């Protein structure tokens, strides 16, 4: 930049009207300061001695004569000055051209000051931006350091240092103080404690499905416990489970383990051990005092009620409308329930009775029924109460209860794939009793509540998805030796919180024989009706 200022001063001195002063110094200086090509230097040398005019008309002929601008004007118009600025600016922005002298390429001896000022301003702006970015990086780096430091000793030292210069206004420590204080307010130990307590509370109140399956197995009452009112009551009731129920569950588990050990001792080594691993330990025998009460009573906790379901197709109409019978799968084979499909019904309608010889609706032994929709993919289980739509009764207890609802969904894998089932049942109270659900109209039933996702006081169960076996070429489930033949009707119903806790299991063992095992909180009537729903044809599913 200093060289350019000197050249500009010399050029302006040559253009001014002083002839005597300009001729003597310019003649020796121009050949030294202009190491231009030979052709351009010749033009300059011929012009200088011929007419040393003060106006400088001859020096402007090669470059400025074409544009027609007089060089005497000290302040050219901005419009005229901007035209050569674009060409000169391009030259200045070229990194290689900056190293050269502009006088080597341009014959014009005068360089515009406006372009130099713009270039300097651009460089200054770039420098300022770089400095600003460096300052920002320097400012942002210090607060990151306290976040990385986790040791308590360093935090204590920093506290002491931070408390000292509080009165100094010019100290650079105050800006990072809030970050350090925030980290100190919530130390790692206290945060983990709070989170642990929250997780414990949520596990006790809401019973998250991520909980351990062992705890779900030990307390099936808590898994199926619901409140009759708001969810807050439900959480309180789940927290306050009686200790007596827990003791009973522990005693039942101990009894089951004792039975397992006694059975294994009596068996010989070798094959007996393999069978013991495959099959479940037999549950203690279930006593049936009164059939009506037993059929409606939930299964005892910690026990599996094993039953056998048989189908009778004999007779003229038995092929289309067979009868079904349920017995306990024991040596005595105690009869529990019987069911048949009604003939003059628009939809699938099964009557369930506790008398195998009298399957009429008007009999005293009528205990419940199973009814489906037109498509045959949704079923509802009722007891023997009164229908609220046919005859209104002032006594609410006489109205029928909805004991269960079964929904069959179309499988994604095609018609030959496994079925998808959803079972809705009433929840259980703290006294291990079923919550009564007596809808007074069709818009308050289990299916409508399930569609509207208002599942208060209800429990939603699903079938356990089977696994494809390449060796057998079919979908398989582990029935623990209770099912021997493949069938679309084979299924296992489980709870989402504990997939290993099988609430209901149904499968084929012969052409007209099936096994039916159910556990708490189901009763025999619910299990039998759910199994009957699998026999009916489903237009939307298969």
UniProtKB/Swiss-Prot annotation:
Tissue: Retina-specific.
Region (Disordered): 1-289
Effect of residue 496 to T: In RP14; uncertain significance
GO biological process: dendrite development; detection of light stimulus involved in visual perception; eye photoreceptor cell development; phagocytosis, recognition; photoreceptor cell maintenance; positive regulation of phagocytosis; protein localization to cilium; protein localization to photoreceptor outer segment
Record's keyword terms, sorted: Cell membrane, Cytoplasm, Disease variant, Leber congenital amaurosis, Membrane, Phagocytosis, Retinitis pigmentosa, Secreted, Sensory transduction, Synapse, Vision
MF annotations from Gene Ontology: actin filament binding; phosphatidylinositol-4,5-bisphosphate binding
Cystines in this chain: none
Record's bilayer topology term: Peripheral membrane protein
Basic and acidic residues bias spans: 91-104, 146-157
GO cellular component, one term: photoreceptor inner segment
Effect of residue 459 to K: In RP14; no effect on RPE phagocytosis
Acidic residues: bias regions: 114-132
Endpoints of the signal sequence: none
Summary of subunit composition and partner proteins: Homodimer. May interact with ABCF1, PSIP1, ZEB1 and HMGB2 (Potential). Interacts with DNM1. Interacts with F-actin. Interacts with TUB. Interacts with TYRO3.
Family matches, as PANTHER family: TUBBY-RELATED, TUBBY-RELATED PROTEIN 1
Protein name from the UniProt record: Tubby-related protein 1
Gene: TULP1
